[in-house]
């Protein structure tokens, strides 16, 4: 019944008249007569390409479509690091990954770090958050940490279960992801009990785990999340015939980093076309369930009379490869993994507007402060999205080009054996690795090769060189890679010392246990050799 109400919601006018611009610095004090409420919904692993054509044809997402019709869609929004914790650290801090040293899912922000929500609270906003946060240090499994720390070791081990699908027994089951639905209910109840009669403006955050794959218990307790799980109810929202089977390069022709990722993700074996299509169908169905949770929030705002007083933002920490480039999960700069949804609607936001310029998740921080009329810190990596989306600035050309014509994304975690850096511009995607010399770069022309099947770095050396110079002007990536390399060794040594005589047993039974236990001495020796290289013997 929930989805039938979309037409009712669509009938209400969302955009309040925006006051005329006076040419001054943007801010809520000028843009809104009263400080608006703000609601941010962040899902996990949602491919941003599903929010616009042609990706939008494969699955029904009525509430995302509602936000598109009544708000602004950013067609080229990207994560600043395609993995949970570092991506969220960038979003909550407004700073690039290397500036906060949020290297992996274990190393994020300090628990006491001042986020945009903290700043808004100090300026009179009532704040609340529910669900997945995952931007501070100290979380995730031992396996996840050790795999990230040892990615430079000269071995190749499967770290994930083979991707698979699992259908819920009850055909009509709607609430498949129980934890997310409970958190959605908590957010709705908070709106009803706490926000509806409050004289304070509020900022509410809801973090969802969907459409992240589920754990795979059949692969053993130490394997990760490789199961795409849903019910027939959600599968009916998927246009099966519209599902595209991605093209794969032969294993022998893959970029070496891609091969490492595919192998560690357990994707180098044989997959039938039916398997691939089912994985993608189940993933899209999980996206449909995510959309319904977003819908619960939108409907609650409408029912409480808050919809015309609230800026609603929807995005995701990263995407999901769903078997593109012979991989699932994220940890990649390919579009399926790095491209995220980003939609904004509410009073003063332009309706039915599509923005094609590149933006990224570090832009959330300044946007939040800008909505609240709070002066923006000068050290932020991000830029406010209001000049691109607000009614107030639609005729103000001098505000249109404040955001630079590029975004930076970087990755330093597990399942990838080299620090990775992406510079995305209007046409080009340039990907550099490690020190810039030991691993060949990649260059894709997304205007002619949207599926990123042809690396043209060698074909266009001038473009490659120019983009590399631009990247180095933004980040000294060889130096950052060296810092991460040293961090990984130091953290591994601390961990090894902390478990003492149990080391051999513990490391053998992490997520890679199926491969490790075949030749445990070989892999221990490989780690020893890695630790000895460029390290202080006394430390080891």
From Swiss-Prot:
Binds 1 Ca(2+) ion per subunit. Glycans are attached at residues 112, 197, 266, 379, 417, 502. Its EC number is 3.1.6.1, 3.1.6.18. It catalyses: an aryl sulfate + H2O = a phenol + sulfate + H(+); Hydrolysis of the 2-sulfate groups of the 2-O-sulfo-D-glucuronate residues of chondroitin sulfate, heparin and heparitin sulfate. Keywords: Calcium, Glycoprotein, Hydrolase, Lysosome, Metal-binding, Secreted, Signal. GO terms for cellular component: extracellular region; lysosome. It comes from the Eukaryota. Substrate binds at residues 132, 255. The active site is at 84 (nucleophile). It holds the Pfam family Sulfatase. Its cofactor is Ca(2+). It is found in: Secreted; Lysosome. InterPro entries: Alkaline_phosphatase_core_sf, ARSK, GAG-degrading_sulfatase, Sulfatase_N. The modification 3-oxoalanine (Cys) is found at residue 84. Ca(2+) binds at residues 44, 84, 317-318. SUPFAM superfamilies: Alkaline phosphatase-like. The conversion to 3-oxoalanine (also known as C-formylglycine, FGly), of a serine or cysteine residue in prokaryotes and of a cysteine residue in eukaryotes, is critical for catalytic activity. Catalyzes the hydrolysis of pseudosubstrates such as p-nitrocatechol sulfate and p-nitrophenyl sulfate. Catalyzes the hydrolysis of the 2-sulfate groups of the 2-O-sulfo-D-glucuronate residues of chondroitin sulfate, heparin and heparitin sulfate. Acts selectively on 2-sulfoglucuronate and lacks activity against 2-sulfoiduronate. Belongs to the sulfatase family. PANTHER family: ARYLSULFATASE K (PTHR46615:SF1). This is Arylsulfatase K. The lineage of its organism: Eukaryota, Metazoa, Chordata, Craniata, Vertebrata.
């Amino acid at each position: 019944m929930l989805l039938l109400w979309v037409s009712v919601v669509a009938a209400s006018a969302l955009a309040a008249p925006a006051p005329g611009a006076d040419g001054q610095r943007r801010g809520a004090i000028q843009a809104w007569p009263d400080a608006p409420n703000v609601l941010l919904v962040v899902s996990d692993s949602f491919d941003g390409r599903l929010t616009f054509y042609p990706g939008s044809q494969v699955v029904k997402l009525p509430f995302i479509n509602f936000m598109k019709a009544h708000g602004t869609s950013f067609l080229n929004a990207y994560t600043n690091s395609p993995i949970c914790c570092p991506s969220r650290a960038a979003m909550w801090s407004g700073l690039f990954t290397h500036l906060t040293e949020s290297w992996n899912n274990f190393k994020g922000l300090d628990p006491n770090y001042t986020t945009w929500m903290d700043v808004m609270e100090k300026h009179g906003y009532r704040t609340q958050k529910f669900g997945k946060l995952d931007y501070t240090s100290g979380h995730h499994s031992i396996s996840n940490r050790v795999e990230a720390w040892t990615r430079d070791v000269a071995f190749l081990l499967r770290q994930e279960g083979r991707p698979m699908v699992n259908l819920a027994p009850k055909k009509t089951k709607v609430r498949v992801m129980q934890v997310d639905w409970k958190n959605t209910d908590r957010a709705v109840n908070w709106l009803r009990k706490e926000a509806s009669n409050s004289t304070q403006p509020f900022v509410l955050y809801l973090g969802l785990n969907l459409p992240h794959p589920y754990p795979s218990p059949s692969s053993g307790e130490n394997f990760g999340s490789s199961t795409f799980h849903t019910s027939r109810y959600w599968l009916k929202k998927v246009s099966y015939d519209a599902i595209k089977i991605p093209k794969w390069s032969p294993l022998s022709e893959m970029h070496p980093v891609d091969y490492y990722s595919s192998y560690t993700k357990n994707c180098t074996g044989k997959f039938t076309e039916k398997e691939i299509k089912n994985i993608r169908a189940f993933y899209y169905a999980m996206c449909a369930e995510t959309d319904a949770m977003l819908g619960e929030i939108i409907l609650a705002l409408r029912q409480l009379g808050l919809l015309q007083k609230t800026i609603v933002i929807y995005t995701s920490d990263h995407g999901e490869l769903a078997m593109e480039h012979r991989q699932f999960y994220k940890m990649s700069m390919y579009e399926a993994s790095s491209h995220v949804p980003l939609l904004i609607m509410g009073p003063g936001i332009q309706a039915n507007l599509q923005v094609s310029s590149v933006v990224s998740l570090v832009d959330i921080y300044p946007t939040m402060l800008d909505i609240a009329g709070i002066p923006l810190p000068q050290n932020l990596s991000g830029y406010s999205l209001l000049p691109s989306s607000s009614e107030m600035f639609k005729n103000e050309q001098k505000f249109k080009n404040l955001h630079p014509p590029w975004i930076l994304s970087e990755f330093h975690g597990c399942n990838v054996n080299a620090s990775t850096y992406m510079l995305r511009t209007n046409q080009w995607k340039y990907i550099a690795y490690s020190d810039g010399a030991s691993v060949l770069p990649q260059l894709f022309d997304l205007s002619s090769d949207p599926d990123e099947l042809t690396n043209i770095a060698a074909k266009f050396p001038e473009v490659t060189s120019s983009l590399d110079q631009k990247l180095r002007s933004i980040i000294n990536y060889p130096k950052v890679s060296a810092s991460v390399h040293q961090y990984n060794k130091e953290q591994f040594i601390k961990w090894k010392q902390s478990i003492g005589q149990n080391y051999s047993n513990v490391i053998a039974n992490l997520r890679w246990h199926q491969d490790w236990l075949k030749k445990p001495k070989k892999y221990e020796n490989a780690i020893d050799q890695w630790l000895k290289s460029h390290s202080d013997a006394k430390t080891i």
